[in-house]
């Protein structure tokens, strides 16, 4: 067999990607919301996202030509478009995106599980968790650390302009001056712990607060924990 015949193989692959669910096609409004949450992270490594447009009333009117560069400047690299209508596959292809039909994804399994909610809860009660990621060096401006599927522990300072993300909890045993996003895949029980709270932005399961809202003196520069309560961020000094 010639060497050319062994040049590559085709195998099945499963990628676990974050999805950006758009709730508006107003790009000015979306740009403001993205700035509030991410700022300009064009120097940071881009994170691959699936662009979910199922919630838009007229997804074909979405200006992807403007949207994709807008997302890229925030460190969001759209790799696929998701919607139940196959007609959008041509739109996705026009902009170099893959197309994922959300109607073809296994939702029937969820419906079948509804008559037996106890079994569903029990099976979901003990998900396989990834090992805790430990970072023992400073996270500098423009850097992004992501602990996929687990907790993140940072033993040094998170500088302004840096971003730490975890699907679980985030522990920063030094000043937290950048952005911290815990529960990135929707874990409402996730928490953020910081030795010195000075963050530009904190977020848990998509609920966020930016530096534009001044931190109260009770936690500014002090050991702090952050958690969700009734869909609102609660920030309290540790030990209180």
Swiss-Prot record:
Q: What GO biological process terms are annotated to this protein in UniProt?
A: cell morphogenesis; division septum assembly; regulation of cell division; regulation of cell septum assembly
Organismal lineage: Bacteria, Pseudomonadati, Pseudomonadota, Betaproteobacteria, Neisseriales
Stated role: Cell division inhibitor that blocks the formation of polar Z ring septums. Rapidly oscillates between the poles of the cell to destabilize FtsZ filaments that have formed before they mature into polar Z rings. Prevents FtsZ polymerization.
| InterPro entries reported in the protein's UniProt record | CAP/MinC_C, MinC, MinC_C_sf, MinC_N, Septum_form_inhib_MinC_C
> What organism does the record attribute this protein to?
Chromobacterium violaceum (strain ATCC 12472 / DSM 30191 / JCM 1249 / CCUG 213 / NBRC 12614 / NCIMB 9131 / NCTC 9757 / MK)
Please give the family membership noted in the entry. Belongs to the MinC family.
Keyword Nucleotide-binding attributed: no
The protein's name: Probable septum site-determining protein MinC
This protein's assembly is summarised as: Interacts with MinD and FtsZ.
Keyword terms of this UniProt record = Cell cycle, Cell division, Septation
Q: Name one Pfam family in it.
A: MinC_N
Does Cell division show up as a keyword for this record?
yes
